[in-house]
Amino acid sequence: LLTACWSASVIAFALLVFSKVHSPEQFSQTYDNVFHLNATESILATGNASTLHLRTLTEPMSQIAMYPAAWHTAAASVVQITHLPVTIAFNGLALAVAAAIWIPGVAWLSAMLVPLPQRTATTAGALLLATATGFYPASLLIWGVLYPMYLAVSLIPAGVGLVVILLRETTPRWGRSRELDPHPRLTLAIAGPLWVLGAFCAHPRSLISALMVALPLLIWTGWRALRGLWRTRPELRRRILWIIAGILAGGVVLAGALVAFVYVHYDLARRPISDHLTGVQARPTETIWGAILQVVSLSAPTGAPNLSTWPLLPLAVVLLICAGWVLVTRQATGWLVWAYLWVGTLYVLAAGSNSDAAKVLTGMWYKDRFRLSALLPVLVVPLVSTTLPRLCARTRWPQAIAWGTSAVLAFSSWMTIAPSIGQGMRVTYRLPAKDSTTLVDGQQAALLRQLPALVPRGQRVLGDPWNGSSLSWVLGDREPVFPHLSGAWTPDQITVATRLDRLGTDPAVCAALTRLHVRYVLDSPRSLNGGGDPAEAQYASIHRAAEEHLMTPMRRSGSNVLYRIDRCRK
């Protein structure tokens, strides 16, 4: 049964996200993916997969520039083992993370929260429901694209499960530890450090996300433990009061330290909070009430412009029933409800408010609603899957009815979110024959794939990264001068970006081109999202050099032209 449920969930997820993607080589044509693809190519070329150095790709003058490298390292390993293109490795890895980490992880967390007799029905339900919402995993494959965060969120259920084991070992009132794990301390000793290391390498902020999800659990468990001692051990009441006072004092000190850090780190004396977090990802896209409705109805933003999934009414109704029953009957899983309300509130603030308070509370996630909404299934799945067997306990076939209900809910949810998720993936991963708004189209991709025959090995390709030339490494095995759309570039890179139209008249241009190993330029009139981004202006001289015929055309594909620089030859 469990194998069948896992298989159904994996197949459903694969169909949801890839049924509208016409080829396994197609990739997300989004801003962030340029970095992710080229970072993986950099690892393959240099052998350096260190988190301490990965961002030197866009900050080449820095000795240390940290960026979580777990995703890129895994993708590079897949390429080395299979000899497949990086783009196929990314798509395969996305499916593997969902199948091997997220789905089993959230099912394991759910099983940890129920007694052994209910474990099969709970696990089966969680396996099915793991892919039944649009919040995660699908949305992070469309928005961004946020591959490191996608990997990091998949690890959070396992981290929360380890917290559950830890609390069971330190809180005797909870009990039932060894019937689910016969060696809990060994599990903590081995899996705990490995999880922290893995989460840090996947994305360090996932540690904060896991803490935010587990915070209500810690408070809930601590309160239950102190309340039990207060009732059963009157002689300890004075000590309990001191413990509570210490916790409150520690909270005040921690809050003060955080306020001081924010004030100093973000230079609030000269730049108010309102001037921070003003990028696209931080702008409110919903009203407060609209965002609340999304949390309640499980209507997820997909990541594609103006596209959300339809409300999951059956699952939303069952979720509300489960939450109400858990709170009214004071179940040990009540913390899941409070955690859902807590994370949901953060999402509402990120999606529906531009206030200073919203920025402070959600700044750890860049006020990005997608990073926060991805945490909701971590709580929805365990809450529903652990409560249904208890609600069905008095029926004739409690386990079968609970599992069957989960199956119906999962199937109806898959059918509901399929059109929106499919459309979002189609729009984001499409490779049109000719288009001026995507990063690369079919004509340019064809030219990029000819680069190995046209550009000698060891030569870099220069171009405006906003028009697809930044993908020369991924599609043409030739390193681009600009491996991302923006960065803290070297003086030579800035010279060729801003003064290429002075070829033949400014010796500094040829000197910079020589040091960068550049004699080939790829030009195209296209631009991601149709152009207009101020960051693209610094590359305008590259287009002017082509317009002024300062370079020799070598190969043309539609409006895309590969040029050779002859004016710098001695």
Regions found by a protein language model. Give the residues of each.
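Transmembrane alpha-helix segments characteristic
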Residues: 9-11, 124-128, 192, 213, ...
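Active-site lumenal/periplasmic loops and adjacent helix-entry segments of GT-C-fold
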Residues: 10-154, 173-179, 429-438
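Membrane-helix boundary/interfacial segments in multi-pass membrane proteins
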Residues: 23-29, 83, 135-151, 272-288, ...
